[in-house]
Amino acid sequence: MEGERMNAFPSTMMDEELNLWDFLERAAALFGRKEVVSRLHTGEVHRTTYAEVYQRARRLMGGLRALGVGVGDRVATLGFNHFRHLEAYFAVPGMGAVLHTANPRLSPKEIAYILNHAEDKVLLFDPNLLPLVEAIRGELKTVQHFVVMDEKAPEGYLAYEEALGEEADPVRVPERAACGMAYTTGTTGLPKGVVYSHRALVLHSLAASLVDGTALSEKDVVLPVVPMFHVNAWCLPYAATLVGAKQVLPGPRLDPASLVELFDGEGVTFTAGVPTVWLALADYLESTGHRLKTLRRLVVGGSAAPRSLIARFERMGVEVRQGYGLTETSPVVVQNFVKSHLESLSEEEKLTLKAKTGLPIPLVRLRVADEEGRPVPKDGKALGEVQLKGPWITGGYYGNEEATRSALTPDGFFRTGDIAVWDEEGYVEIKDRLKDLIKSGGEWISSVDLENALMGHPKVKEAAVVAIPHPKWQERPLAVVVPRGEKPTPEELNEHLLKAGFAKWQLPDAYVFAEEIPRTSAGKFLKRALREQYKNYYGGA
């Protein structure tokens, strides 16, 4: 088979290497006057253009070279969404180096660990994160230069504007060479490193931008709420640059009022982020009666969007699409849209369809498989693990052979650890993380299904459901609920769940009311902390 492939009939096509720098070069040439708008940490709104970003990215290349950065060296960033971070998104890969977007929401210990593990040579960071950098600076073994992404810097640090050098030419590295890296933000163990190639992120940006995905075009105004330190900001800065769309980068202020000001003031048509941001925005819009002037499409990722959230935004004229991915998958591998022959379904049926995770995007091979790697029936009921193959799926973890071995199946699929069902149309519906499924009396209960149903109750703002040890049933669900105003009674919530189709044995045995639910750095519920806090609640630990 390998021999047949080697002896295949040759094509006449040019062998041009894929490179992220080409996105910015095209945007500067064709859409050079298109704006890139940033809200900085000070609240100031900064305006630039693709032509200026291109020129300054070339100057950043020159400046980094003067600091000793060469092909293959790692350059880390600790920063939110703004124009300087966008310049680094292109300059670092463009010079053949590797952009390591580190997550400032990790603990200082974890940040020091990943910067040392990646052996970063230069650290670019936002000025408001100076206390964090000062706290870990003494622990960093390889960082030689600390650059504050601002006009000025305190003594002992270099200001970004002063670090810019003479314009330098890009370096055309092989398309399979590394261009970026990120570390997982899981709830167990040390973060694991994933290294992205130019080829992976170019193909990912193209596939995710198709009409049945984000459907980005030059006419769009794109505001990524997802941070640029989180899995390439779902590749939106790359994809928006690819098509020449205006970009609005919101900085660290993601409260509803600040977002609405940017949405309306800049004519934003497309945005993307995690459900918690959109739940808060929906509450704000409904309480104020405000209607967004230009927003038309909204992507939800990071965790499942409750059906009620989709319905709320659709009533406001905003189309909501689910997306799914992981750090290990660059990240997007699944996006939701309604197939043409299903458009005749009732609005309720279509809403049910939109609440599913979606369909694998082009070039991604996806299966929902049992423990032996065999696909489970496409009946919408049989549970299996989501397993993936594709040009932007990781084949392992950086410097971690043990984690690499456990992450891959014998036939080379990546094991996500996410449990799902799929139906005859191919729609995937993530039910839970493997570690978050609740096994009660030998039967499985999905915590995600319970959470999404509970958040559809008018008196529930947020809900997290966890498995708690039980002396008789092995595990039973416990729901931690943040009320919306008046606190609902357990009886009200149980009645709501029964009406939603849950059996009595699937209902939580207890409801705990709280002011907030702890979260991971990626905005997901920190269920490990809840399990630890309530482990003795049923007397089964």
Swiss-Prot record:
Top EC class for this record: ligase
Protein name (record): Long-chain-fatty-acid--CoA ligase
Subunit annotation: Forms a domain swapped homodimer.
Note: Upon ATP binding, the fatty acid-binding tunnel gated by the aromatic residue Trp-234 opens to the ATP-binding site. The acylation reaction proceeds in two steps, via the formation of a fatty acyl-AMP intermediate, and is proposed to follow a unidirectional Bi Uni Uni Bi ping-pong mechanism.
Keywords: ATP-binding, Fatty acid metabolism, Ligase, Lipid metabolism, Magnesium, Metal-binding, Nucleotide-binding
Family membership: Belongs to the ATP-dependent AMP-binding enzyme family.
Residues that, per the record, bind tetradecanoyl-AMP: G302, Q322, G323, T327, D418, K435, K439
Pathway: Lipid metabolism; fatty acid metabolism
Enzyme Commission identifier(s): 6.2.1.3
Function of the molecule: Catalyzes the esterification of a number of long chain fatty acids with CoA, resulting in the formation of long-chain fatty acyl-CoA. Myristate (C14) is the most efficiently processed fatty acid, followed by palmitate (C16). Also catalyzes the esterification of stearate (C18) and laurate (C12), but at lower efficiency. Does not catalyze the esterification of the unsaturated fatty acids mysteroleic and palmitoleic acids in vitro.
Cofactors named for this entry: Mg(2+)
Stored SUPFAM superfamilies: Acetyl-CoA synthetase-like
Catalysis performed (reactions): a long-chain fatty acid + ATP + CoA = a long-chain fatty acyl-CoA + AMP + diphosphate; tetradecanoate + ATP + CoA = tetradecanoyl-CoA + AMP + diphosphate; hexadecanoate + ATP + CoA = hexadecanoyl-CoA + AMP + diphosphate
Residue positions binding ATP: V231, W234, G323, T327, D418, K435, K439, W444
GO molecular function: ATP binding; identical protein binding; long-chain fatty acid-CoA ligase activity; magnesium ion binding; protein homodimerization activity
Source organism of this protein record: Thermus thermophilus (strain ATCC 27634 / DSM 579 / HB8)
Lineage: Bacteria, Thermotogati, Deinococcota, Deinococci, Thermales
InterPro entries: AMP-bd_C, AMP-bd_C_sf, AMP-binding_CS, AMP-dep_synth/lig_dom, ANL_N_sf
Residues involved in Mg(2+) binding: T184, E328
